[in-house]
């Protein structure tokens, strides 16, 4: 076990579930530390008042439960979507992007309450331990961090349940055995991993999907919506302006009802292993398609292509936990500069798991009818100019061909 004997007061990222309740009691009994709890409402869809009651029952005096949904979407999700960030070609980073926000609040509460440490419930095998801790150290280089899953002596679920029983921590009857899979959720997405999902050759059971109906069960009639953008951020649906969190929640409803946003993938974790996950990102999938569509008529080709080159690196930084790094902030500044004229409206058709762009318009559009028309362009484009353009671009190819023949 790492030495935490000098820790007096700890801020714990607390869900109210069995695992973090055991961690709470472990911090009290094994370290003798005073515990402050922080529970974030990230739009996970759970009632959070039970977390307060359970913390009170376990003797906690300082309890923080905060609604961070608007901050989450405005300051973390939307900046990420300006970049069109996708990890390994498919993953929209729903879990990754929530961790720096949680760490930020843990550090803020530690400063406010005079705590000298923070604690989290991430295991020693996953990415989240890295994300939580890199973010925390970036915000407070002197903070102590306790990760009980790396420190304690419990070897099995039975050990945890025995500890819970010994310390009178309530255990729901359906928690006596291990859950069939692990779940993480927020307003952007839900992820399911482990247990029944560990064999990547087997299809995930339908009951794993909690955010969307199956595409096969989706309506036979398509849903058509319009998403409005300003400076790269979605601001309206069908002409109705909404706050960031409200807008994403509405897109989630459209995605859910049309079976959109399911993903079954094997990803490369930062710690080195491969992991199979089943993710649902209904609103985010719609948002990404809409954002790329509005960029297609408002971004210059050079800027658009450079963004696409930078995106995998930007996505990696978020996945690995470097949200608060200078390189991510540098990339963000460039991305945000590119979004100054990304405004307008995109029309999308949602149908049985598919998001189809069927229209896009903008007062800042670079699309020119005169240039692309198949009819008389009235001198807007002289096709004779193409001959010289091609000849100059072919110069090196012709030189190579002449040498090699």
Swiss-Prot record:
Location of the protein in the cell: Cytoplasm
Keyword Ligase: yes
An example Gene Ontology biological process: L-arginine biosynthetic process
Catalysed reaction equations from the record: L-citrulline + L-aspartate + ATP = 2-(N(omega)-L-arginino)succinate + AMP + diphosphate + H(+)
Main localization category: cytoplasm
Binding site for ATP: 13-21, 40, 121
Annotated positions binding L-aspartate: 123, 127-128
InterPro entries, A to Z: Arginosuc_syn_C (IPR048268), Arginosuc_syn_N (IPR048267), Arginosuc_synth (IPR001518), Arginosuc_synth_CS (IPR018223), Arginosuc_synth_type_1_subfam (IPR023434), AS_cat/multimer_dom_body (IPR024074), Rossmann-like_a/b/a_fold (IPR014729)
Superkingdom of source: Bacteria
Family assignment from sequence similarity: Belongs to the argininosuccinate synthase family. Type 1 subfamily.
Protein known as: Argininosuccinate synthase
Lineage: Bacteria, Pseudomonadati, Pseudomonadota, Alphaproteobacteria, Hyphomicrobiales
Gene: argG
